[in-house]
Design a protein with these regions (language model features):
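PP2C/PPM-type serine/threonine phosphatase catalytic domain
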Residues: 1-128
């Protein structure tokens, strides 16, 4: 639908969006993502990113082209490599996460993760 709207409405041409989705059933979470919206698992006071960012900066980090330090100030760190709406099909990453009692799931956009370090997010979770 996002792609169709982009094709049919000139104001929305080349419009795209990222998504993270999660279905929890019993002790399992099935997670899907496209783009740089993330899902984290908080367990035993540790925050673990489950999804993989579909972004230029993450691709360059993974290939060893740039370092973590270089990624912080990378000029094109907002460039995503996968999104909904730009093409008529998209590859979606799917993850299965086994859950245990006390686990928390955090789904968020880069609006959160571009402003807060993981340690800050953990502090906020601990406060609640």
């Amino acid at each position: 639908e996002v792609y169709k709207d982009s094709e049919n409405n000139t104001e929305h041409r080349n419009m795209g969006t990222t998504i993270v989705a999660c279905l929890v059933h019993d002790d399992n979470a099935i997670v899907a993502n496209v783009g740089d919206s993330r899902l984290y698992l908080y367990r035993d006071e540790e925050l673990k990113q489950i999804t993989v960012d579909h972004s230029l900066v993450n691709d360059l980090l993974s290939s060893g082209t740039i370092t973590e330090e270089e990624a912080v100030d990378f000029a094109q760190k907002n460039v995503i490599t996968r999104s909904l709406g730009i093409q008529d099909t998209v590859d979606v990453d799917i993850f299965n996460v086994e859950l245990v009692k006390g686990d928390l799931i955090l789904m968020c956009t880069d609006g959160l993760t571009s402003q807060l370090e993981n340690e800050d997010i953990v502090d906020i979770i601990k406060a609640y």
